[in-house]
Amino acid sequence: MIDVRNLSIRFGSHLVIDNISFSLDRGSDMVILGHHGAGKTSILNWIFGQVKGSGEMIIDQVKMSNPTSKKLLKSGVCLVPEEGCVFPDLTVRENLLFSQTLINSNNPIPENEGFFKNLYHLLDTKAFSLSGGQTRMLSILMGMMRKPKYLFLDEPFAGLSQDAIDTFMQQLKILKSKN
């Protein structure tokens, strides 16, 4: 379980997040809704130690003080940011292999199945040649390959077709059932 307690985030004199608390059980879904500029991304950035704020976070009964991406990855927490995490000069295959290296995984790249089927024919294509939706799918796949306990997605459907969204949701259900 992830517990966030009494989170407040301020940028200068502007209070963006005012004393919110929430809990997220492993395997559950949570959506943070709000208009542009409401602080949704700021919450994720605080969780991942990228912005300062007050409050506390407990992951699986361990208090996380000064969280870093490395600490969070070791705790099974993964963020796929809105802008993605793809290296444009690498091919799709190289991006996936690099992602595997980061997690010390020897698992083969998933072949023509599920969410990946939309990218499989592009394995040897440089990421800078992908459409916005394809780049987004690659970022999400790189995050899902880590098989995280907790997967945070910032604006997960930006640039995706309805077909890709439906396929992604099916794959997410499969991932949740396996973990």
Regions flagged by a language model, labelled:
Residues 2, 17-19:
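Conserved structural motif at the start of ABC-family nucleotide-binding domains
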Residues 33-35:
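The feature captures the beta-strand-to-loop junction immediately N-terminal to the Walker
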Residues 48:
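Helix-to-loop junction immediately C-terminal to a conserved catalytic motif
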Residues 55-64, 75, 107-114:
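Conserved ABC transporter NBD signature motif
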Residues 63-78, 83-84, 124:
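ABC ATPase NBD coupling module
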Residues 126-130:
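Conserved ABC ATPase signature
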Residues 144-149:
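A short, proline-enriched helix->beta-strand linker immediately N-terminal to the Walker B motif
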Residues 155-156:
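Walker B catalytic motif
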